[in-house]
């Protein structure tokens, strides 16, 4: 079978979700020269806020993820910088790209060794800072704008931070829980949900 241009990026994200994606989430949109970029941060296992540094798991420091998305091929930071708070627990920590937008398309980095020349460090407050040379819009076969995904360096190859399924009954139909949050099909692919065909099925 012929792979689509998006195959490697999607496969890399799905494989690494169970290794890195957990904890609280923060999303923000910054504007540079009238064009927007979205930053989405997951703080890591058991880390629910940017300020939390206690009550965390052994895997907390080596989990978490940053996703950067711009939907404009002309996006540019110009002379500005983009600062993203990864959380205080991640202060002075090394991060590497998992996916990186380039003029040749989205490049995937399966492990720390593959991304050895692309390491960035957070500051004493846990901020990652990007310059205009690092983030800019592109028009390629798999991207019109910019996409970058960053993860902590040093996670074991077999790290799995997924939460075990829960059969606990809740009063509300939709509730945010760690167990629910671990389910990719619920979060990202709601088009797989079945729809009723008659009133009696409600």
Where do the PLM segments sit?
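Short hydrophobic-aromatic micro-motifs
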Residues: 1, 65-69, 150
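Aromatic- and carboxylate-lined catalytic core of secreted/periplasmic carbohydrate-active enzymes
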Residues: 1-51
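Intrinsic-disorder/low-complexity loop/linker signature
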Residues: 24, 34, 81, 104, ...
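Carbohydrate-binding surface patches
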Residues: 30-89
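Short, surface-exposed beta-strand/loop "edge" segments at domain boundaries and coil↔beta transitions
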Residues: 46-51, 73-79, 103-108, 136-141, ...
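Solvent-exposed beta-hairpin/edge-strand motifs
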Residues: 85-104
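C-terminal beta-strand-rich structural cap/linker in extracellular carbohydrate-active enzymes
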Residues: 111-200
């Amino acid at each position: 079978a012929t792979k689509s241009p998006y195959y490697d990026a999607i496969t890399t994200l799905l494989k690494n979700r169970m290794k890195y994606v957990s904890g609280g989430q923060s999303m923000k949109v910054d504007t540079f020269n009238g064009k927007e970029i979205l930053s989405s941060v997951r703080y890591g296992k058991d880390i629910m806020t940017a300020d939390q540094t206690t009550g965390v798991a052994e895997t907390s420091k080596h989990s978490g993820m940053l996703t950067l998305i711009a939907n404009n091929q002309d996006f540019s930071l110009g002379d500005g910088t983009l600062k993203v708070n990864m959380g205080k627990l991640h202060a002075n920590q090394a991060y590497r790209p998992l996916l990186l937008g380039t003029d040749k398309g989205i490049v995937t980095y399966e492990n720390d060794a593959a991304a050895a020349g692309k390491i960035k460090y957070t500051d004493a407050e846990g901020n990652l800072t990007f310059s205009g040379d690092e983030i800019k819009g592109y028009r390629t076969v798999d991207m019109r704008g910019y996409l970058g995904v960053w993860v902590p360096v040093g996670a074991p190859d077999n790290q799995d931070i997924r939460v075990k399924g829960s059969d606990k009954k809740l009063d509300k139909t939709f509730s945010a829980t760690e167990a629910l949050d671990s389910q990719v099909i619920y979060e990202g692919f709601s088009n797989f949900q079945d729809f009723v065909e008659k009133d009696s099925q409600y």
